[in-house]
């Protein structure tokens, strides 16, 4: 499995290199065609280099000073880090005893425009994976350049991409605000409804909303009701006497019936 993974990675790397070579060849053909059409006048086309790693406290002025040695540098743009990540870093610095004023905003990536794309290609190919600082006392001496030339990429493409990201961020923020507003309204409605219920429980003018159920009277309740009527006590006493007589009669029948049966068995 490890060998298969290595083979797949090698194939991907080879395909990427082939794409870059084809793109460079296509650009060289375009340059040759432009040169043949214009004769001795060559049109200078700007090129953009992507900076994938930006060290802490590395600013656009630093990259302009470092790269302007190799050619004329035009526009430079650095993408600031996410505000949430910055707040976490500030909190960690404050928890570690560091002053928050010393922490400055950092960047995650950048784009550098050269006036001539041939110089941009040469700079990206020669400075990639080399130390950023040439002097020993430079704070970026142990950081390496991570440069890549962007084929057929113009500054307008970058502007469109950044505008799209801003629009997406605004839409996400609007959706989060709307969701928070819906949750707040739902909570307030529940609170108001609970307050109305509490006020209704303490209001004596409102009818009681409790449920009542009627059940059939039991035998004991019926006897008690009959006993409470006039003449009912006598009937109840007679009923109890009759019940006792029935029980006594049955008991005597069982006793004497068993004795008579035993005597009949003894007689031959």
Swiss-Prot record:
A single GO cellular-component term on record: nucleolus
Keyword Disulfide bond: no
Signal peptide: none
Subcellular locations according to the entry: Nucleus; Nucleus, Nucleolus
Sequence ranges of Polar residues compositional bias: 206-217
Molecular function terms from GO: DNA binding; RNA binding
Coiled-coil stretches noted in the UniProt entry, renumbered to this chain: 6-38, 163-193
InterPro entries: ABT1/Esf2, ABT1/ESF2_RRM, Nucleotide-bd_a/b_plait_sf, RBD_domain_sf
Disordered: annotated segments: 200-242
Ligase among keywords: no
Keywords: Coiled coil, DNA-binding, Nucleus, RNA-binding, Transcription, Transcription regulation
Xref: Gene3D superfamilies: 3.30.70.330
Domain annotation RRM: ranges: 47-144
GO BP: endonucleolytic cleavage in 5'-ETS of tricistronic rRNA transcript (SSU-rRNA, 5.8S rRNA, LSU-rRNA); endonucleolytic cleavage in ITS1 to separate SSU-rRNA from 5.8S rRNA and LSU-rRNA from tricistronic rRNA transcript (SSU-rRNA, 5.8S rRNA, LSU-rRNA); endonucleolytic cleavage to generate mature 5'-end of SSU-rRNA from (SSU-rRNA, 5.8S rRNA, LSU-rRNA); regulation of transcription by RNA polymerase II; small-subunit processome assembly; spinal cord motor neuron differentiation
Family: Belongs to the ESF2/ABP1 family.
Biological role: May be a novel TATA-binding protein (TBP) which can function as a basal transcription activator. Can act as a regulator of basal transcription for class II genes.
Subunit structure and binding partners: Interacts with IGHMBP2. Interacts with ESF1/ABTAP.
UniProt name for this protein: Activator of basal transcription 1
Source organism: Rattus norvegicus
Organism taxonomic ancestry: Eukaryota, Metazoa, Chordata, Craniata, Vertebrata
Gene: Abt1
């Amino acid at each position: 499995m490890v060998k298969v993974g290595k083979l797949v990675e090698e194939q991907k790397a080879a395909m990427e290199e082939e794409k870059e070579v084809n793109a460079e060849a296509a650009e060289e053909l375009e340059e040759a065609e432009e040169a043949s059409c214009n004769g001795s006048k060559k049109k200078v086309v700007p090129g953009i280099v992507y900076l994938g790693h930006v060290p802490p406290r590395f600013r656009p002025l630093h990259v302009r000073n470092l790269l302007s040695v190799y050619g004329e540098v035009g526009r430079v743009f650095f993408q600031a880090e996410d505000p949430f990540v910055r707040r976490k870093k500030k909190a960690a610095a404050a928890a570690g005893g560091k002053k928050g004023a010393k922490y400055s905003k950092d960047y995650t990536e950048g784009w550098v425009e050269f006036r001539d794309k041939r110089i941009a290609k040469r700079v990206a190919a020669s400075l990639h994976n080399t130390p950023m600082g040439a002097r020993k006392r430079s704070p970026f001496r142990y950081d390496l350049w991570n440069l890549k030339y962007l084929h057929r990429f113009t500054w307008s493409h970058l502007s469109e991409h950044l505008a799209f990201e801003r629009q997406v961020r605004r839409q996400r923020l609007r959706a989060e605000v709307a969701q928070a507003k819906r949750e707040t309204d739902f909570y307030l409605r529940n609170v108001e409804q609970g307050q109305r219920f509490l006020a209704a429980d303490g209001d004596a003018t409102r009818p009681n909303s409790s449920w009542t159920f009627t059940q059939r009277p039991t035998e004991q309740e019926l006897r008690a009701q009959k006993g409470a009527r006039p003449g009912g006590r006598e009937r109840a006493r007679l009923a109890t006497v009759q019940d006792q007589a029935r029980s006594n009669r049955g008991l005597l029948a069982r006793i004497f019936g068993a004795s008579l049966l035993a005597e009949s068995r003894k007689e031959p």
